[in-house]
Amino acid sequence: MPKIIVRRLEREDLETRVAWFNDPSVYGQMTIDIPVSLAGTEEWFSQNRLNRSRADFCFFTQNEEGAMSRIAMCGLVDIDLHHRRAELYVVVNPQMTGRGIGKTAVQWLCNYGFSELNLLKTYLFTVPQNQRAQHLYERTGFVLEGILRQHVCHRGRFTDRCVYGILRDEWLEQQWRDECVVKLEVPT
């Protein structure tokens, strides 16, 4: 298995982020407005670079020769340290789905949120038709907390939004908690 490296999202990742978000297999499962433009994403990045209520990351694999490949972009948004909660999101390279990358990213983000940020709860939203993601979230300890009916306009139609959450105590019970070996490497 190649080495996995995580670092904060950087400007150099934005072109790839735009390509992934504009991929039908990605935007079909998310409630984002498309097309996503590079100029708009650069503006978003500049506005949010120092925003302390979010933490965006990029996951890479590194082969034996040292070459790096982006495999996922993910993060915690709406970080609320007073109420000790944050929303989680994950986008896997569309060419690399089904390889456990999403699971690794979810586990790493939970570990980061609960260990580093001392969160009480991590939650996320998904659309009902994204059953693959729902299965992943349930396997990693998330619980379906409810369904927000006709909550968002998705691909021209109003659709429900599923709300999943995991509490700190539930995370502490997860067997994978101590097995997640991905480490954050922050350039100095």
What are these model-predicted stretches?
Residues S115-F125:
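Conserved GNAT acetyl-CoA-binding A-motif
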Residues N93, L124-Q134, H151-R155:
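Conserved beta-strand-loop-alpha-helix junction that forms the acyl-donor binding cleft
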